A protein has these predicted regions:
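Catalytic domains of carbohydrate-active enzymes, especially glycoside hydrolases
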Residues: 18-42, 63-80, 185-191
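Surface-exposed amphipathic alpha-helices with a cationic face
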Residues: 24-25, 109-124
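Active-site-adjacent "subsite" loops/lids of carbohydrate-active enzymes
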Residues: 3-10, 15, 77-106, 111, ...
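N-terminal structural segment of carbohydrate-active enzymes
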Residues: 1-57
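Aromatic- and acidic-residue-enriched segments that line the glycan-binding/catalytic groove
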Residues: 42-78, 131-158, 195-267
């Protein structure tokens, strides 16, 4: 069985390309994935915290491995390459603009890839499946009409993941253009790994996505009865958001095993 590890750029920016790759090789890693961005410390109050706050839950976390000598800090990022803009012509979403950080640090990505390849480690690039511009999970995101929807058609008020609808043609077109661009910029990689090609269930509402009109159109093409699905899921959503009563609890307590009554409740809602 192959062993794969994701190593984000900030770590080998700090600890050195050769040092990181040597440790991976010593651990007999078969493949690595990294992402096409670079990072630096920032003093801008609007910069991102590392580690991420993650909707407040991560605000007490500290880094296990320090970055730039700190276990928590503000950072800014930039793409590690200069995008080929003709690939994105006419698209809703655009790649991030290179900065001075790109020019100064961008070469660390191909250096890391070459160092891994020289040790017979497969190299992959990891990008976000539905968070344009896709380089890093903590920035970017979709426009409102490309966001996942609840069965009542609304956008959840509280989400951690900023993923767009996986059926959005705008996001699909951008992802195709980004894929072409990455293969142009890094032609020697073994593959591309699309991170978060799902709706991560951090909150209860996340379980009830996606009823975006883009998904309705996809369901029709695939022969699914989307209105029936939407009505059934909406009924369950309402049951779990204010519709539960003592009667449901009594059914739970009526048997030694709570699983079967719960399943019956969910199926008979």
């Amino acid at each position: 069985m192959a062993t794969g590890v994701t190593v984000l750029p900030e770590h080998f920016q700090n600890e050195g390309v050769d040092a990181v790759v040597e440790r991976l090789a010593a651990a007999r890693v078969d493949m690595i994935a990294t992402s096409p961005y670079v990072m630096e410390p920032s003093t801008d109050p609007k910069a991102s915290r590392e580690p991420p706050i993650d909707a407040g839950a991560g605000s007490v976390r500290l880094l296990d491995r320090p970055l730039w000598g700190k276990r928590e800090l503000l950072v800014s990022t930039a793409p590690s390459f200069t995008p080929h803009l003709p690939f994105y012509r006419g698209l809703r979403y655009r790649p991030a603009t290179p900065t001075a950080l790109t020019q100064r640090e961008g070469n660390v990505i191909p250096r890391f890839l070459r160092a891994a390849q020289s040790r017979h480690i497969q190299t992959w690039l990891q990008v976000q499946a539905a968070i344009p511009p896709g380089y890093r999970v903590q920035f970017g995101g979709p426009q409102d009409d490309d966001k996942p929807r609840l069965p009542d058609g609304s956008i959840p008020k509280r989400r951690l993941a900023n993923n767009g609808s996986l059926a959005s043609p705008h996001i699909l077109d951008y992802t195709l253009a980004l894929t072409r661009d990455l293969l142009r910029a890094y032609p020697d990689i073994d593959g591309i790994r699309f991170d978060w090609p799902e709706y991560p269930p951090y909150f209860l509402d996340d379980v009830f996505l996606d009823f975006n009109p883009h998904c309705a159109a996809a369901a029709r093409r695939l022969g699914f009865d989307f209105p029936r699905m939407q009505q059934a899921v909406l009924a369950l959503y309402r049951l779990l958001h204010g519709g539960l009563t003592n009667r449901h609890l009594e059914r739970q307590l009526a048997t030694d095993s709570g699983r079967q009554p719960l399943l019956t409740t969910l199926l008979d809602h």
